[in-house]
């Protein structure tokens, strides 16, 4: 389930955190998007 974990951070809306990489985020399509990074 994808939810907005980075409200207020540009490019981080509707991202899924990766359990093995808390700073990196996956897009809701399920593919890693290097642009969708934000603080936890």
From Swiss-Prot:
GO terms for molecular function: serine-type endopeptidase inhibitor activity. The keyword Disulfide bond applies. Keywords: Disulfide bond, Protease inhibitor, Secreted, Serine protease inhibitor. It is found in: Secreted. It comes from the Eukaryota. GO terms for cellular component: extracellular region. The record marks 26-27 as: Reactive bond. Its main location: secreted. Disulfide bonds join 2-16, 6-28, 12-38. Signal peptide: none annotated. Belongs to the protease inhibitor I20 (potato type II proteinase inhibitor) family. Inhibits chymotrypsin and subtilisin strongly. This is Proteinase inhibitor IIB. It comes from Solanum tuberosum. The lineage of its organism: Eukaryota, Viridiplantae, Streptophyta, Embryophyta, Tracheophyta.
């Amino acid at each position: 389930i994808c939810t907005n974990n980075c409200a207020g951070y540009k490019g981080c809306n509707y991202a899924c955190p990766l359990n093995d990489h808390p700073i990196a985020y996956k897009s809701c399509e399920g593919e890693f998007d290097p642009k969708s990074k934000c603080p936890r």
